[in-house]
Structures are given as structure tokens and as C-alpha cells.
A protein has these predicted regions:
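Subset-of-secretome marker
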Residues: 7-143
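C-terminal motif of bacterial Sec signal peptides marking the signal peptidase cleavage site
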Residues: 2-3
């Protein structure tokens, strides 16, 4: 596998939009190219996102119902007056990758049997949708 003997490292990435008042922070743990876990914290303001508090509660309740039995996956949301904070963790050492694939929590070619998730490919994927790497976990704050 090549990951043996290597220490677990953390990479921090962020997608922040001051105008839309949304902030997504992801901490990626990996050992070599093998992904260990992803931990994301999203802060989104209702008004700027164009949704009400009740609408987002319904969306997240449906999401939670669909994914509640997925091993290695945890999710929570905290609702404030003007915004909500959503936390999602996927522990790839506990999860069944086939189930994550079926639930579209990870992407891989349908026919491919996967043994692990590549850190390099997931980082490239996040960067392709606008995430930027953050040094030492020093995230930009919403203003």
C-alpha cells in the first residue's frame, strides 16, 4: 500500500464567499496518499443563501434520514437566528467504501472496486470546485 510507516498528516482547505456569507472548512487527514478522514464545518447565512431556517431544517432532516445508517459517517447541524452551522465527518477507516459510493458521498467509476480513497485525487477534486489550501489551519473568517 505504501502508507505503512508514514505519519498521519492534516491538510486544511476552505471555500469562502463573503458576498454570499458562506464558509466551508474541511480538514483532511491522510497517510501518504490514503485518505483517513474528512471533517467539514459549513457556516451558511439563510438570507444570502435564499433559504429560510425551516427550509434548511427540512433539507437537513431528509439528508440525515438518508445517511443515518452509514458506518463511519456523522453529521450534525446547529441552527442560529441568521445562519446555521453544519458539521460532517467521514472516517474512511470505519466506512464501507462501496456504501459511500452508492450513497454518492464519494465518487468513483461505477465499475471500479475501490480499496481506499486517494488523498491527491480528492484534493484535486476540491480545488477544481474552488477550494483553496489553508496553511496551519488559519482559516479566513466571514466578515
Amino acid at each position: 500500500m505504501g502508507a505503512c510507516g508514514k505519519s498521519v498528516e492534516k491538510t486544511y482547505i476552505q471555500s469562502i464567499n463573503q458576498a454570499r456569507k458562506s464558509d466551508v472548512r474541511i480538514t483532511i487527514e491522510h497517510q501518504g496518499d490514503k485518505l483517513i478522514s474528512t471533517d467539514s464545518v459549513s457556516t451558511v447565512y439563510y438570507k444570502e443563501a435564499g433559504v429560510s431556517k425551516d427550509e434548511i431544517k427540512n433539507i437537513i432532516a431528509n439528508y440525515d434520514a438518508e445517511f443515518k445508517d452509514v458506518k463511519g459517517y456523522s453529521h450534525s447541524a446547529e441552527y442560529k437566528d441568521e445562519y446555521f452551522v453544519e458539521k460532517t465527518t467521514i472516517d474512511y477507516t470505519k466506512a464501507e467504501l462501496k456504501v459511500l459510493q452508492e450513497k454518492k458521498l464519494i465518487t468513483a467509476q461505477k465499475s471500479s472496486k475501490i480499496d481506499y480513497i486517494s488523498y491527491e485525487s480528492i484534493l484535486k477534486s476540491f480545488k477544481s470546485i474552488g477550494f483553496k489550501e489553508v496553511k496551519n489551519g488559519k482559516f479566513e473568517e466571514l466578515k
